């Protein structure tokens, strides 16, 4: 992270010494119990997707809390694991919108410029939202603010009430926001299904002269 395109710009948005606080927090939680994702994958979203490459942002809440699921990318799991319910619904909507994708691992999206950002970057095993409100939100809000400052258009995809609260951080008029209910089984039928976020994103990118995302790759 230290040498990434993000580092200094994020640092400007944070209180003094906040990176030190994050490192101290991670030292403590990884030494005291099982935490996901593996420590070397915590910052995967911004390590795989450099700031200059960001075309799309998909905001999640926190990592999956089961063994081997979390990869540091929102909604993504390794291909050898079953898709969790929200990801199943994302892939179902993708199939209806554009076409079928067999991969559960969304790294290829990240490599194309889709920033798969969770608001909270770590979670204790089997404790959803177990690290919420402790350290990460100022950092990930800073990431969103840095993307908001970009001079090239970005699509922000906000699924569910939690992600939609981040809308207040996105005030640059060149960007485009797509909102819908969350893809979880509890809310997918309330407007996520049929929202066509993938084709709508590509339509916006095409109109702006930006290469589209190959969502099926």
UniProtKB/Swiss-Prot annotation:
Reactions accelerated catalytically: Hydrolyzes single-stranded DNA or mismatched double-stranded DNA and polynucleotides, releasing free uracil
Class of enzymatic activity (EC top level)? hydrolase
The residues annotated as the active site are: 62
Q: What does this protein do?
A: Excises uracil residues from the DNA which can arise as a result of misincorporation of dUMP residues by DNA polymerase or due to deamination of cytosine.
Protein's name in the database: Uracil-DNA glycosylase
Gene expressing this chain: ung
Query: Per its UniProt record, what NCBIfam families does this chain match?
Result: PRK05254.1-1, PRK05254.1-2, PRK05254.1-4, PRK05254.1-5, ung
Which GO biological process entries does UniProt record here?
base-excision repair, AP site formation via deaminated base removal
Write down a Pfam family by its short name.
UDG
Subcellular localization: Cytoplasm
Q: What are the protein's GO molecular function terms? A: uracil DNA N-glycosylase activity
Per UniProt, the keywords (alphabetical) are: Cytoplasm, DNA damage, DNA repair, Hydrolase
GO CC terms on record? cytoplasm
């Amino acid at each position: 992270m230290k040498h990434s395109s993000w580092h200094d710009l994020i640092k400007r948005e944070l209180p003094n010494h906040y990176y030190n606080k994050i490192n101290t927090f991670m030292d403590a939680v990884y030494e005291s119990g099982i935490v996901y994702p593996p420590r070397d994958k915590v910052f995967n979203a911004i390590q795989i997707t450099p700031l200059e490459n960001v075309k799309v942002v998909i905001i999640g809440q926190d990592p999956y809390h089961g063994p081997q699921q979390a990869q540091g990318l929102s909604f993504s799991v390794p291909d050898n694991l079953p898709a969790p319910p929200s990801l199943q619904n994302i892939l179902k909507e993708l199939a209806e919108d554009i076409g079928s994708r067999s991969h559960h691992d969304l790294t290829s999206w990240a490599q194309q410029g889709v920033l798969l950002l969770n608001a909270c970057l770590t979670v204790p095993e089997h404790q959803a939202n177990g690290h919420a409100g402790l350290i990460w939100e100022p950092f990930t809000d800073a990431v969103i603010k840095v993307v908001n400052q970009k001079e090239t258009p970005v699509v922000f995809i906000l699924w569910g009430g939690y992600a939609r609260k981040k809308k207040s951080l996105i005030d640059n008029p060149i960007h485009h926001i797509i909102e819908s209910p969350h893809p979880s089984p509890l809310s997918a039928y309330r407007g996520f299904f049929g929202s066509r976020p993938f084709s709508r994103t590509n339509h916006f990118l095409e109109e702006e002269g930006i290469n589209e995302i190959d969502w099926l790759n």
